[in-house]
């Protein structure tokens, strides 16, 4: 049975919802799953003034936690076409794990969100995936077995590189059922791959 970590940063709850969907998909494949978030770097007064969702159920992750899992799925919103500073800061602290090769051979994946359809989701996924490849991980994206990314009848996220959602400029659009289904599908694929590789 694979042990999967869904590691995320979510300012307004969109990525939190996607993280829980990824976790649900991994559990459907029989994995043991933990959902953890990275620490907020924005001062609390500023976060409250900007209506950040600070009451998230997931516990805070510690960098050394990463070595305990067969698979790690990383999610964060887009910040100017790249991952958030909160997630980048957390991953930057994993140099010791990198130096020891502690993440070699683990399965990795990425998911993201943006305000608009062309708001940098794919480049954000690439920024996450680049980190995971440097750690020596095997990447699993959102393959075209998920038919929900093939249609054009609705506005929807999703790319072969990972599940995504579109939040709208004011954050008013929650992840759609299709986007959540994509996240569940990717979570299941990652858990199944980890089980094959790690038994």
Curated annotation (Swiss-Prot):
Binds 1 FMN per monomer. Its EC number is 1.6.5.2. One of its GO terms (molecular function) is NADP binding. It is an enzyme of class 1 (oxidoreductase). InterPro entries: Flavodoxin/NO_synth, Flavoprotein-like_sf, Flavoprotein_WrbA-like, FMN_Rdtase-like_dom, NQO. It comes from the Bacteria. It catalyses: a quinone + NADH + H(+) = a quinol + NAD(+); a quinone + NADPH + H(+) = a quinol + NADP(+). Transmembrane segments: none annotated. Its cofactor is FMN. Substrate binds at residue 98. FMN binds at residues 10-15, 78-80, 113-119, 134. One of its GO terms (cellular component) is membrane. PROSITE patterns: FLAVODOXIN_LIKE (PS50902). Residues 4-190 form the Flavodoxin-like domain. Keywords: Flavoprotein, FMN, NAD, NADP, Nucleotide-binding, Oxidoreductase. HAMAP family: NQOR. Belongs to the WrbA family. This is NAD(P)H dehydrogenase (quinone). It comes from Nitrobacter winogradskyi (strain ATCC 25391 / DSM 10237 / CIP 104748 / NCIMB 11846 / Nb-255).
């Amino acid at each position: 049975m694979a042990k999967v970590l869904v590691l995320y940063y979510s300012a307004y709850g969109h990525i939190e919802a996607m993280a829980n969907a990824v976790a649900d998909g991994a559990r459907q494949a029989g994995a043991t799953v933990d959902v953890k978030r990275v620490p907020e770097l924005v001062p609390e007064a500023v976060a409250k003034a900007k209506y950040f969702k600070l009451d998230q159920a997931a516990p805070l992750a510690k960098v050394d936690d990463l070595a305990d899992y067969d698979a790690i799925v990383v999610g964060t919103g887009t910040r100017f076409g790249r991952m958030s500073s909160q997630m980048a800061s957390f991953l930057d602290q994993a140099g010791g794990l990198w130096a020891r090769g502690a993440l070699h051979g683990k399965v990795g994946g990425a998911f993201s969100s943006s305000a608009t359809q062309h708001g940098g989701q794919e480049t954000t996924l690439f920024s996450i995936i680049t980190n995971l490849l440097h750690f020596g991980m095997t990447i699993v994206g959102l393959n075209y077995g998920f038919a929900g990314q093939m249609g054009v009848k609705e506005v929807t996220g999703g790319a072969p590189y990972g599940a995504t959602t579109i939040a709208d400029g004011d954050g008013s659009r929650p992840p759609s059922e299709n986007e959540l289904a994509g996240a569940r599908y990717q979570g299941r694929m990652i858990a199944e791959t980890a089980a094959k590789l790690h038994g």
